[in-house]
A protein has these predicted regions:
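Sec-dependent N-terminal signal peptides
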Residues: 3-18
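N-terminal alpha-helical modules
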Residues: 17-130
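Short, intrinsically disordered low-complexity segments
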Residues: 1-2, 105
Length: 130
């Protein structure tokens, strides 16, 4: 009897934590969306902080456009166009997760223009010194 009660509780506790594929896809997309919003906030802060450096701003905008092109190409390299169903029902989740990963990597790189580089770094380039 104890085994039956245990299995019954185990089944319902596991079932309560499960998600549908649609919920998993939605959660992954929302995580990507948050990462993308953060990237855009950081990008706008950089534009504001460095607004007096026209050459840097021009180059940053060019770099960001190229990064978007790279990101899109990277997505297609990881998930080439295939017949429907090739990647299975998990594909939207995988797509969003990889977009999130690429976006967070870009945000990390951009943040350096806001956090600055330690004084004494001879290769700071356009990045402000702390």
């Amino acid at each position: 009897m104890k085994k039956i009660a245990f299995l019954f509780l185990l089944f319902f506790s596991l079932n309560s934590f499960s998600q549908t594929q649609l919920e998993t896809d939605e959660e992954a997309y929302n995580n990507y969306y948050k990462a993308d919003r953060e990237l855009n906030i950081i990008y706008q802060q950089i534009l504001k902080e460095y607004k007096s450096d026209a050459e840097f701003i021009k180059n940053l905008k060019t770099a960001q456009k190229i990064w978007i092109t790279f990101r899109d190409a990277e997505m297609l390299a990881k998930f080439p166009k295939r017949e429907p169903g090739y990647y299975g029902s998990i594909q939207p989740t995988c797509w969003s997760n990889y977009l999130q990963e690429l976006t967070e990597e870009r945000t990390k790189r951009l943040k350096i223009w806001l956090t600055g580089i330690e004084e004494g770094n001879m290769c700071s380039g356009s990045v402000n010194i702390k």
